[in-house]
Amino acid sequence: MKYQLVFIGFGEAAYNISLGLASEGFTNMAAYDAFMDDPQRGKLIHQRAEEAKVPLISLEACAEGRFIASMNSAKVAVSVASGIIPQLKSGQVYVDLNSASPTVEEEIDKIPRAEGVRFCDAGVMGTYLTRSEIFLQQQQMPRQKDIRKDDS
């Protein structure tokens, strides 16, 4: 894979998440945003991408990510997923981070895909700028795998 993480949609959430990941040493990211060439919205998208050191790529190039994080709108979640998931290969993970209903997520999960392509419905609980310590249990679990390293 060319990128470890690709964002589809580079608005406020993806921008802040990319800053947080970069601060932890995770830098192999790229992003696509449908409005990146828009005369009004595009300037901010390009400024944020430059600041976060996240290259902006084509929608087609998003299929070159190990993890593809969809962070656009619940209204377009299925159509975006339908355009990307069928192109993915074994070992890639499509993560839907939109605030979509369970019915929409089930529809995305039913999109035909190659064997070994994974789908994850995930939620966003704040951003890097509003981060806080979260304690889920009394003792820290050993880390299973460092996703910053490409072992595919």
What are these regions (language model features)?
Residues 5-7, 94, 119:
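Short glycine-aspartate micro-motif
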Residues 11, 35, 74, 98-101, ...:
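Short loop or secondary-structure boundary microenvironments that flank
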Residues 31, 58, 96, 119-121:
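Hydrophobic residues in well-ordered beta-strands that form the structural core
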Residues 77, 100-101, 106-152:
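Rossmann-fold dinucleotide-binding core
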